[in-house]
Amino acid sequence: MLAGCKPYEPVPAEFDALVHRAWELWDVGSAEDMEALASAFTTVAPTHPASDGPLRGSMARLTPEQRDVVPLEPRPLADGTVGLPDPVDAAPMLVLNRFECTMAQFEPTVYHLAQDELFEFYDSYDRTYTSSLEDYLSGVNDRITWNADLEATVTLAGVYSETLSGGLRRAQTANGTLLLTRTWIPVPAVWSSENKVFDQDYQINLYMQETDDTIVHLQGVWRHLDLGALGTTESEFVVNAMMSSSIDWDRDTAKLCAEGRP
């Protein structure tokens, strides 16, 4: 293992179960389901307190049935057929972290159209809403959905472009506001260089206010990425870099909150 890498070990089962359940329920979950998710989150998160630092590790892979809760476009497969990618190839990553912000400050960063104005990770980001932002902000609907075309640069690997589908759901529960974001890539990303693959990416994020000025963030990712000589999402080096990137994202979000942006 390279210096500075942490072991990529399974997280406690209750975190694994919560992330998978949230992924499955984003679309179809009832108000009662959201209450159960929020209750589980507020019960599980304190078992890994802030004093222990971020929790990071592996979890169960998605099943074909869990993959199918989001629409993907068929594509050529390695066996010469056309179909959907096998989710067993998408490596699982889970991160629990906390950052300083209030929910009222944080939520606008999620539905902000020009994400590249907020986060330097993107070279470009063009989002189009596929449901009404006005209805979401007024409370008529509890969710908003979007598609985005984006470009980003991976150091030493090159530039990739992708289409990202996603959405934000807000649930008012007895334990407070629960925000759920879910994103995925319906088609493989396109690279500027050869011998790179990024064809599966499924993400679910849960956010709740833990203290007056702290948000607790639980992220689950299932991703298939092959960077050639740099490694794949089956290597600890690549996976650790990605989990560190999630923690950096929270740090940058806290900075936005401190600056009163967006």
Residue map of PLM features:
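C-terminal motif of bacterial Sec signal peptides marking the signal peptidase cleavage site
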Residues: 2-4
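Eukaryotic helix-grip
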Residues: 8-262
